[in-house]
Amino acid sequence: MSEYKDTLNLPETGFPMRGDLAKREPEMLKRWYQEDLYGEIRKAKKGKKSFVLHDGPPYANGDIHIGHALNKILKDIIIKSKTLSGFDAPYVPGWDCHGLPIELMVEKKVGKPGQKVTAAEFREKCREYAAGQVEGQKESFKRLGIMGEWDKPYRTMDFTTEANIIRALGQIADNGHLLKGFKPVHWCTDCGSALAEAEVEYKNKVSPSIDVRFKAADEAALLAKFSLNEGHQGQGDVSIVIWTTTPWTLPANRAVCLRDDLEYVLIQVEGDNPERIIVAAELAKDVMDRAGIEHFHNLGFAKGADLELTQFQHPFYDFTVPAILGDHVTTDSGTGVVHTAPGHGQEDFAVGQKYNLEVANPVGSNGVYLPDTELFAGQHVFKANDAVVETLKEKGALLHHHAYEHSYPHCWRHKTPIIFRATPQWFVSMDQAGLRAKALESIKGVQWMPEWGQSRIEGMIEGRPEWCISRQRTWGVPIALFVHKETAELHPNTSELIEKVAQVVEQKGIQAWWDIDAAELLGDDAAQYEKVLDTLDVWFDSGVTHYAVVDKREEFNGAEADMYLEGSDQHRGWFQSSLISSIAMKGKAPYKQVLTHGFVVDGHGRKMSKSIGNVVAPKDVTNKLGADILRLWVASTDYTGEVAVSDEILKRSADAYRRIRNTARFFLANLNGFNPETDIVPVEEMVALDRWAVGRALAAQNEIVKAYDEYNTHAVTQRLMHFCSIEMGSFYLDVIKDRQYTAKLGGHAQRSCQTALYYIVEALVRWMAPIMSFTADEIWNQMPASLPSGESRDKFVFTGEWFDGLFGLAEGEELNNAFWSEMQKVRGAVNKLLEAARSDKTIGGSLQAELTLFADDALAAKINKLEDELRFVLLTSAATVKPLSEKSDAAQATDIEGLFVEVRATEAEKCDRCWHHTPDVGTIEGHEKICGRCVSNVDGEGEARKFA
């Protein structure tokens, strides 16, 4: 063998079998940035049709987690695939930099503003802290192979962006959507600030559930509403009963609310302490059961509408409250009578406005009753629940009390229960200028993926309250408005003033607002106007980036955002704040497509939790397995639902990666010595199987590009794996090894094969590039340096487009796709019999076998098209076809109807060079150890191959 070894075309490549990604990827990253890969992409795509994926900014606090990695990798895959599809797809990453979490971190270091440091110093410390957090997260994202404007990201705290956020506020005010109101808002007593809807999360909480009596102020007038018969009016005090789980709100009660069409019943409670109570008829039995009242009877009925404006005594204060009517009253639970405190609930506030009720708010920003609150001054509201219950008992107003577990709003940061609290706030009004209706209409023009996203955001927009955009914080973009000290009206020149402020902020940052002397801007008006000192909700900051970033950054060339891509929780967050602000400013949605992904869970479907110990950190994965494994995991998941990750799941991704890598390595190793400029075989002269393989690559490419276009990365990876493992690995690459290794070096048989391998790897490397970016770059650098045209290969795979050199077989060809599909089935059936023969020691390897295939006429005609090259497809030393009628006794049935196969151990000698057993081994003078085919390949013109 040694004398012929040098005549074999053995594979050779500098592309290693082991990826060793954790070590190699940082070296590749270094080269990407040294050679300005992102800049090269931008240059290559300049002037192409644009595709803008606008980055939802992560919060600049803490290390990135696996959810961040999922999100950013998905964005990167989509942008790279769009680039390969010929789009100019810039990516400007962003960060959300203002807000409470950063304030809290800075407070730990320097204390609260106004104590050890001034507010100005505090803001500067916040800016420094956020900048450091951005840098840390930036490096983590870059390590994942994500390409973008990392040197010029957008940060909501950049002076220019802060100025544009202020301008956005001005436009919303100009368009009539800004509202100043004294309204109940979600209030976190730990934050000391209002919260947006998106900052509220619901968790179970145990609260006191109480049924409370409100005595009738005028019994006779009330009883007259029930049309009772003379002498059947009952006995004892008359009360209407409310149910609540927030006893602490009772000091602010200003009404009891009924529904106009509900029937209410006057019940006589019997026994030693008779009384008469009023509840909704539907709920009467529930109320009686709950209160443990067994003996009672009904005295009469009245509609809610009949009881409107009847007066009742407050249970512990010396004033009366009216019965009012509201549509929000239901019979799902409670008594059908709703305790109404306009200062502590949005529905209460809304119905209170109709009846001109006082909006009482006896609670301070820290959750403590104000000093003038009768009975409860100085107590924290949640601790005061017990005191309120005791007071109700003392006053004889408590009908029933028990502990009740229910879903309750909590602060997303502190994880503590929040309250509704009426305060003066700034709102983006949903209805005063038709914003809600316009938003709902615009939603229909957006493509929501998955489709359920549309109904989800529609429901949220339909039901949402006014957007409270003001915060009582230090580190945030100011609500840069001047209001009249007496009327609270905006200054008549607000538009011009906002632009002047924005110009100063553009130069000096938000601190400029607090530094500006009102007289500088207002002149003589300064005496009548005061600055608003509230800051903007951070959801406003990020929500207006469609204007502050997309409209303003030169990278986007004035194009609108095509896509927003975030987690499904952003229907109530960024998707919604962006939509509302864009409609308020421009009258249209800020995006054309909205794509959402689910949350990351562990292999058992549980949320990531340090206490459970199931947290998978991106850094740990890249340090151990490499970023390409993490990227392949992201691409392989159906990300529209929950996305599972665990060591076992990542191991499966690593296994899949190895199969793809090994396929690519086979291609590269067998292109050794191939020069596309001089060695390409014309299509019409290629061996039939080689043309089929290129056709399979074309079919795969069509499906893969379609899947990329539909953002279906899961389908991309499935098709890629099928192509590498099944179409190539299990069939084509297996069949061509003999020809590639043993054919005449540089002869037609070998060059045809290499031509196919070259075309396929040109396509394969591009399919991989959006997902396995590092490995694709590594492959690219091992591919032939020159192209068929003689031009040099581009420096990077990412600057090009999908390979356009593939071609398919015509269906009219004799050896078309259907033919090769049938041959794969025949080969599969034969392989089962060869495996059995190996198991029973009839043969060693398949090249020790000779086959006779007994086939029916139709199948035999197809198989015979391969002529004497059938044995190469079946990987045996000999294979002949005979009619089924001549079937031998030794022939075995296969799982193909009309096909029997006889497997025999060959008696021919083994060729030292190709290992085939053929009768001519030892018959050729001077080459006694090799077969005639090998002699031709070593000393002659080389074997001719037409089919395989």
Swiss-Prot record:
Highest taxon of source: Bacteria
Entry's Gene Ontology molecular function annotations: aminoacyl-tRNA deacylase activity; ATP binding; isoleucine-tRNA ligase activity; tRNA binding; zinc ion binding
Catalysis: reaction(s): tRNA(Ile) + L-isoleucine + ATP = L-isoleucyl-tRNA(Ile) + AMP + diphosphate
Protein's UniProt keywords contain Ion transport: no
Motif ('KMSKS' region): 607-611
Cofactor, how bound (note): Binds 1 zinc ion per subunit.
One GO CC term, this protein: cytosol
Coarse class of the protein's main subcellular location: cytoplasm
Cofactors, names only: Zn(2+)
Positions with a binding annotation for ATP: 610
Top-level enzyme category: ligase
Protein EC: 6.1.1.5
Name listed for the protein in its UniProt record: Isoleucine--tRNA ligase
